[in-house]
C-alpha cells in the first residue's frame, strides 16, 4: 500500500509582493517615513485619518491580486530580473523533468491507449536512433488502472532487472488475442442474465494468461516506480500497489500476476481476487481499480511530489512531464430519453458503470489541468478519443469480444491519433488544440529523448531510484544497495 510522504512547500507569494513594493521604489519608504514623523506632530493627525490615496489603493489592489493569483492559479511574477531569469533557467535545467506515464482503466477500449503507446514507442526509436528503445527507458514513473494497470506491468516488468518483458505493441495485441477467452463469445450481459454468473470462465482465462506472462515476478521486479490501484473489500477502501513500498518491506510486495488480476477484477466480469503479500502479512480482497481510481494521473503526480527520496530535486508541477492516456469519450450517440425511460436496473448496470468511470476520469483530467496552470500545454498531455464517426456504440463495448467490435475499436484508435488534441482549460471546459494527437505524441517523444540525453551531462542525477537486486531464481530477496540510478 502506498504511503504519501508529506513535506511543507515553501510559498513564493511573499517574495512576489516584496518585489512589487520594491518596484514602487522609494515611494513606499518615503510614505512610511513621513507617516512616522506625522505621528510625532499633533498637527498632522487629521492628515493621517484622511481617506487613502489613489496610489495606495492601487498598490493594495495589486498586492492582493498577486496573493489571490498565487494561491488560486499558481501565479508567478511575469517580469523577473533578466539576470535572475537566466540563473533560474539554468537551475531548472539542472533539476530536469520527471517523466510520468498514466493509463486509465477500461476493458476492450484499452485498444486505444495501447495503439497510442505503440505509436509513441515507434517515435522514440526514430528520434533516439535506438531500434531497441522501450517506453520504460524514458519514463520515471508509471501508473495504470484496470487494463491500464496490466499495460503498466507489461511495459515495466522485467525478468533480468535490465530490460522490460514486453514491447508497446504487445499491449493492444494482448487484448485482441485474448478477448474471447476473457469475455466469452456470447457477451457478458447475456451470460449474466442467462446463467446468473458471467465471470467464472473469464477469471480462469485471466489467471492463466497473467501467470504465463509474469510467473513469480513481484512488484520489486519492475524497472521503475509503478502504481497500480484496486479496491480492497476487506478494508473498504482503495489499495495502491507501489514498487516504492514493496522495496521497503515484503509486507507490501505482491506478485505481479495477482496485482494485474486485482486491478482488472471488474465486478460482474471477473471474480474478486483474494491475495496476500509475499510474506503473508498483508491480505487483500480486491476488485477492479476503476472503482477506486479510473484515472490514476493525480496519484502518480502526488507520489512524485511527496517522494523526496527518489525525486530529490522536484519543486512543483513545472518539474514534471506527464502523459495521460484515456479510454475516450465515445458514447455520444446513445441514451435517447424515450428509450432509457423504459430501462430497468439490469439495463442501467453497464451504462452506469461507464458513465461513472468516464466521469471520474474526466474530473481528474480537469483537476490536473488546473494544477498545471500556465505550464499545462508544455508539461501535461492528455490523449484520448473525442467522439468517433465509426459508431453507433453499444454500452457493452468494453466487454464485447466480437470481431466487429474489435475491428471498430481498432479503427477508432487510428481515428483518435489523427484527431485534434483536446485540452482541459482552467474553468473553461475543453479546447481543441491546433496539433493532432499524432503530432502531440511526436512532440512528446522529442521532449522525452531530450530529457534522457540531458541527464548524462547534469551535475547530479535527476532521479535516485532505490534498486532491487535481481536473482536468477526470480525470488524476492532484495535489498537497498544504495545505488543512485541514472536512466537506462
Swiss-Prot record:
Keywords: Cell membrane, Growth regulation, Hydrolase, Lipid degradation, Lipid metabolism, Membrane. Highly expressed in roots and at lower levels in leaves, stems, flowers and siliques. Disruption phenotype: Increased length of leaves, petioles, hypocotyls, primary roots and root hairs. Changes in lipid levels and composition. Induction: By the fungal pathogen B.cinerea and an avirulent strain of P.syringae pv tomato. SUPFAM superfamilies: FabD/lysophospholipase-like. It is found in: Cell membrane. Residues 23-49 are annotated as: Disordered. The active site is at residue 145. It comes from the Eukaryota. It is an enzyme of class 3 (hydrolase). Possesses non-specific lipolytic acyl hydrolase (LAH) activity. Catalyzes the hydrolysis of the galactolipids monogalactosyldiacylglycerol (MGDG) and digalactosyldiacylglycerol (DGDG), and the phoshpolipids phosphatidylcholine (PC), phosphatidylethanolamine (PE), phosphatidylglycerol (PG), phosphatidic acid (PA), phosphatidylserine (PS). Favors the release of fatty acid at the sn-2 position for PC. Possesses acyl-CoA thioesterase activity. The nitrogen atoms of the two glycine residues in the GGXR motif define the oxyanion hole, and stabilize the oxyanion that forms during the nucleophilic attack by the catalytic serine during substrate cleavage. Belongs to the patatin family. This is Patatin-like protein 7.
Amino acid at each position: 500500500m502506498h504511503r504519501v510522504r508529506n513535506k511543507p512547500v515553501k510559498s513564493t507569494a511573499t517574495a512576489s509582493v516584496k518585489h512589487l513594493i520594491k518596484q514602487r521604489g522609494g515611494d513606499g519608504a518615503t510614505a512610511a517615513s513621513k507617516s512616522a514623523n506625522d505621528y510625532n506632530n499633533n498637527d498632522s493627525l487629521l492628515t493621517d485619518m484622511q481617506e487613502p490615496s489613489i496610489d495606495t489603493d492601487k498598490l493594495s489592489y495589486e498586492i492582493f491580486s498577486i496573493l489571490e493569483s498565487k494561491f488560486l492559479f499558481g501565479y508567478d511574477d511575469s517580469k523577473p530580473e533578466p539576470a535572475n531569469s537566466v540563473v533560474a533557467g539554468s537551475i531548472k535545467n539542472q533539476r530536469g523533468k520527471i517523466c510520468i506515464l498514466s493509463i486509465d482503466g477500461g476493458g476492450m477500449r484499452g485498444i486505444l491507449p495501447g495503439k497510442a503507446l505503440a505509436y509513441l514507442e515507434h517515435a522514440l526509436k526514430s528520434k533516439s536512433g535506438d531500434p531497441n528503445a522501450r517506453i520504460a527507458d524514458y519514463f520515471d514513473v508509471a501508473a495504470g488502472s484496470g487494463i491500464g494497470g496490466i499495460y503498466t506491468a507489461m511495459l515495466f516488468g522485467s525478468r533480468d532487472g535490465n530490460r522490460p518483458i514486453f514491447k508497446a505493441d504487445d499491449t493492444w495485441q494482448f487484448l485482441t488475442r485474448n478477448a474471447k477467452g476473457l469475455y466469452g463469445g456470447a457477451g457478458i450481459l447475456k451470460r449474466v442474465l442467462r446463467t446468473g454468473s458471467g465471470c467464472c470462465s473469464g477469471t480462469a482465462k485471466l489467471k492463466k494468461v497473467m501467470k504465463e506472462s509474469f510467473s513469480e515476478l513481484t512488484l520489486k521486479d519492475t524497472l521503475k516506480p509503478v502504481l497500480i490501484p484496486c479496491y480492497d473489500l476487506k478494508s473498504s477502501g482503495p489499495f495502491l500497489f507501489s514498487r516504492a513500498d514493496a522495496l521497503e518491506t515484503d509486507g507490501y510486495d505482491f506478485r505481479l500476476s495477482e496485482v494485474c488480476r486485482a486491478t482488472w477484477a471488474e465486478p460482474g466480469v471477473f471474480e474478486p481476487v483474494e491475495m496476500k503479500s509475499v510474506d503473508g502479512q498483508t491480505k487483500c480482497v480486491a476488485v477492479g481499480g476503476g472503482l477506486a481510481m479510473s484515472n490514476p494521473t493525480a496519484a502518480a503526480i502526488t507520489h512524485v511530489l511527496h517522494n523526496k527520496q527518489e525525486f530529490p530535486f522536484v519543486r512543483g508541477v513545472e518539474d514534471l512531464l506527464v502523459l495521460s492516456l484515456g479510454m475516450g469519450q465515445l458514447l455520444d450517440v446513445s441514451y435517447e430519453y424515450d428509450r432509457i425511460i423504459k430501462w430497468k436496473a439490469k439495463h442501467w448496470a453497464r451504462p452506469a458503470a461507464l458513465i461513472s468511470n468516464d466521469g471520474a476520469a474526466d474530473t481528474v483530467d480537469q483537476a490536473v489541468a488546473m494544477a498545471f496552470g500556465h505550464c499545462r500545454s508544455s508539461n501535461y498531455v492528455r490523449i484520448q478519443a473525442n467522439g468517433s464517426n465509426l459508431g453507433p456504440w453499444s454500452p457493452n463495448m468494453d466487454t464485447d469480444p466480437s470481431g466487429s467490435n474489435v475491428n471498430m475499436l481498432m479503427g477508432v484508435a487510428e481515428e483518435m491519433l489523427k484527431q485534434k488534441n483536446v485540452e482541459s482549460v482552467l474553468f473553461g471546459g475543453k479546447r481543441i488544440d491546433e496539433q493532432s494527437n499524432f503530432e502531440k505524441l511526436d512532440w512528446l517523444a522529442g521532449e522525452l529523448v531530450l530529457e534522457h540525453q540531458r541527464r548524462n551531462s547534469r551535475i547530479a542525477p535527476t532521479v535516485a531510484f532505490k534498486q532491487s537486486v535481481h536473482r536468477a531464481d526470480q525470488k524476492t530477496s532484495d535489498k537497498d544497495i544504495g545505488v543512485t540510478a541514472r536512466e537506462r
